[in-house]
Amino acid sequence: DALEPGSNVLMSFDYSPGTKPEIQPMAIAMLKQLFRGNHKVFLMALWPDGKFMSKDALKEVLKEYPDKVYGVDYVNLGYKPGGEIIINQLAKDNDLSVLFPADLTGLSINSIPIVRDLNSKDPDLSILQRFDFVISLSAGSVGTKEWILFGTDPAGVDFTSGCTSIQVTGLLPYADNNQQMEGIVAGLVGAAYYEKLMDYRGMARKSLPAQTYAHIAIVLFIVLGNLIYFIEKKDES
């Protein structure tokens, strides 16, 4: 919300269908917030399946924002292999077309208005430094940690992450005092809170009760198993 309207924001979709239930809801919520703020959104992926995750998220969000124009308000750069090497190049190089000669649809990158506007910024700035904010939607490596270590921290760019719940404890040190990361959205619970802040009932808020009941059932089965074990042990004695 603190970003000025028209800010350039880079979103990296670094996850696969296996973690889609956790991360896709937060991706959709973030895209909605960015479109609501009239920001310029650049999507990319460091995981092969990430390009499909970004397409699905966009398809969902554009139902609410049909006035957003491809190439003007947002662009999908697609998947780029190379992991942390790509992140490092984004932090050092100043020509986006070297890394992404074309977008996901095959359009020449330099023919896209939103990219030309980005390239018109101070030529002394790296590609990453031309962005006002960077977001990693991460299910592991390559993901949030690599973006911090090889990209946003060295480049001095504001950054946040949406990640799986299993990752969050390992990433919290980077968020201490907002030194290297502006907070974390973690797992389905984090996505549900995000949807609540955005004042809509999305996939996370709809799925959370089912997850809660499943966790309760697991705990009950564990307790029941222990009770049966102790009863049988007592009978044997």
Predicted segments with their positions:
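Short extracytoplasmic
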Residues: 1-25
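Short, aromatic-rich amphipathic segments at membrane interfaces
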Residues: 173, 177-212
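Membrane-embedded segments
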Residues: 18-75
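A mature extracytoplasmic/lumenal domain signature
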Residues: 13-17, 43-48, 81, 163
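Juxtamembrane interface at the cytosolic side of transmembrane helices
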Residues: 222-237
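Structural recognition of alpha->loop->beta junctions
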Residues: 51, 55-84, 178-194
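Membrane-proximal low-complexity regions enriched in glycine and acidic/polar residues
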Residues: 73-170
